[in-house]
């Protein structure tokens, strides 16, 4: 397997791996800082600011990817289907000129918009605004005609008032060793998640046997999200093909995401022989990255594909990923949003 760049510390998700002393020493400092910051907002010493439309925040209490982007894309699509005009506010992690706000379109260069915002715009056609100030992004979306705002990875952005919080959890890794950064993966204590309105557990492919953990407090909704792959999209512009056409064949599989093994496992489950190539999350690709030495089809996630468009050829394929949630989740969410809209006069 190709491995390049920094990786998630092994001790975050393995209780048998010793935690380095410097990491343990810094935990109380980090914990005190985040507790103070949250207390300032909860007690009103720092003010939250809202916008005149419903705001959904999608986020997690752990560092790294948990499936927020597939869920955000599914949220946008479902809201559009229900007659809403959603807009997405994002930081645009890893982009150039990170301090500059901008609109992101499907054809915006990833270096300017960030890989996840460009992917969201490409998949949904929704208005996407990247800004380190999520409140400013939300206001811009409302001014542009959006009647609901989805704040991607905004759980810790307390300055923006929100109506619905959705926590996304990796169904396999959950909360790791349960420790705060840098000794563990937690941005905030696990107890913070109980303040959210919904918990979406990303179980990955449908064949998984992982079971959700019921929350302690009554009324908190925990919902399973499964990810499915059924087709491949040639990146040279040709029509999509069934993924089944590659069953029994060997391919190079590329993933520059937080948990690349999940993508590789999904391909293997479809009978595809995988030569895995894991890159760091948000990796900036060059054509030279694909000099694998053997001429096989190269399959990658859509998040990776948007960064490879400038040098795509007939050997590169993206694999569309679809997030599937129970119908009851959508009924519960849409019912809450409709009640909010009627109160806000949207």
UniProtKB/Swiss-Prot annotation:
The keyword Lipoprotein does not apply. It comes from the Bacteria. Pfam families: LpxK. Its EC number is 2.7.1.130. GO terms for biological process: lipid A biosynthetic process; lipopolysaccharide core region biosynthetic process. GO terms for molecular function: ATP binding; tetraacyldisaccharide 4'-kinase activity. One of its GO terms (cellular component) is plasma membrane. ATP binds at residues 62-69. Pathway: Glycolipid biosynthesis; lipid IV(A) biosynthesis; lipid IV(A) from (3R)-3-hydroxytetradecanoyl-[acyl-carrier-protein] and UDP-N-acetyl-alpha-D-glucosamine: step 6/6. Keywords: ATP-binding, Kinase, Lipid A biosynthesis, Lipid biosynthesis, Lipid metabolism, Nucleotide-binding, Transferase. Coiled coil: none annotated. This is Tetraacyldisaccharide 4'-kinase. It comes from Xanthomonas oryzae pv. oryzae (strain KACC10331 / KXO85).
